[in-house]
């Protein structure tokens, strides 16, 4: 599967804000955005005023980068969101939140979505008792996500278990059993990403 292989910190600088793509490092002075908060490139320090289209495009790019999704997948996800009941923009964010890699990240198994995606791809998780190694797999309400038995002894997973993170309302976890459960669909107020989804809808509606 295609994926972005460039410098992660440049993505935050391009969007003009921290996207927290590197987990704990983003909270330290080592974060590249702290040292250089302007866009990369020769003329990055002098930001031009964006047109309406440019603003909408930047918002889409920001959402793609936060969730680690490339254009084709993002477009397909939007088209699914558009066909669902409700508000297309909110549906889009809900679908992105319900990706397995994001759920693993929200459960605390990964300092970043990138790390969570790698853990999924390497086959460390079961969904309802069956191994799933596809990061884009869409989980559903009442699905149970479990760390594989053979992975639980690793220092990485022990560390995650010893330092549980606060969960969104739509998830619950049993840390001792290395298990999490989707108990509801995420509401918009439960999704803490700095994205104005209305601008994305406007962009795709043209």
UniProtKB/Swiss-Prot annotation:
Keyword annotations from UniProtKB, A to Z: Ribonucleoprotein, Ribosomal protein, RNA-binding, rRNA-binding
Q: Which GO terms describe its biological process?
A: ribosomal small subunit biogenesis; translation
Which Pfam families does this chain map to? Answer: Ribosomal_S4, S4
Task: Report what the protein is called.
Answer: Small ribosomal subunit protein uS4A
Record HAMAP family? Ribosomal_uS4_B
Record's function text:
One of the primary rRNA binding proteins, it binds directly to 16S rRNA where it nucleates assembly of the body of the 30S subunit. With S5 and S12 plays an important role in translational accuracy.
Query: GO cellular-component terms in the record?
Result: small ribosomal subunit
Q: Does the keyword Ribonucleoprotein apply?
A: yes
Q: Which family does it belong to?
A: Belongs to the universal ribosomal protein uS4 family.
Quaternary organization: Part of the 30S ribosomal subunit. Contacts protein S5. The interaction surface between S4 and S5 is involved in control of translational fidelity.
Q: Which domain of life is it from?
A: Bacteria
Q: Which SUPFAM superfamilies match?
A: Alpha-L RNA-binding motif
Q: Does the keyword Ligase apply?
A: no
Q: List the disulfide bonds.
A: none
Gene Ontology molecular function, alphabetical: rRNA binding; structural constituent of ribosome
The segment(s) forming the S4 RNA-binding domain are 98-163
């Amino acid at each position: 599967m295609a994926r972005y292989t460039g410098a992660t910190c440049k993505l935050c600088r391009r969007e003009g804000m921290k996207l927290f793509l590197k987990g704990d490092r983003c909270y330290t002075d080592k974060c590249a955005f702290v040292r250089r908060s302007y866009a990369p490139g020769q003329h990055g320090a002098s930001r031009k005023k964006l047109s309406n289209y440019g603003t909408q495009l930047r918002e889409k790019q920001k959402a793609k980068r936060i969730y680690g999704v490339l254009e084709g997948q993002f477009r397909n996800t939007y088209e699914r969101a558009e066909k669902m009941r409700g508000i297309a923009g909110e549906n889009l964010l809900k679908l992105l939140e319900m990706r397995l890699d994001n759920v693993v990240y929200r459960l605390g198994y990964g300092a970043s979505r990138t790390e969570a995606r790698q853990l999924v791809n390497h086959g460390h998780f079961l969904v309802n008792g069956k191994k799933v190694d596809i990061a884009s797999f869409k989980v559903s309400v009442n699905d149970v996500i479990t760390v594989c038995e053979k992975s639980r002894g690793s220092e990485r997973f022990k560390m995650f278990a010893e330092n549980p993170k606060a969960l969104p309302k739509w998830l619950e976890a049993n840390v001792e059993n290395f298990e999490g459960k989707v108990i509801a669909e995420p509401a918009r107020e439960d999704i803490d990403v700095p994205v104005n989804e209305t601008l994305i809808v406007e962009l795709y509606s043209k």
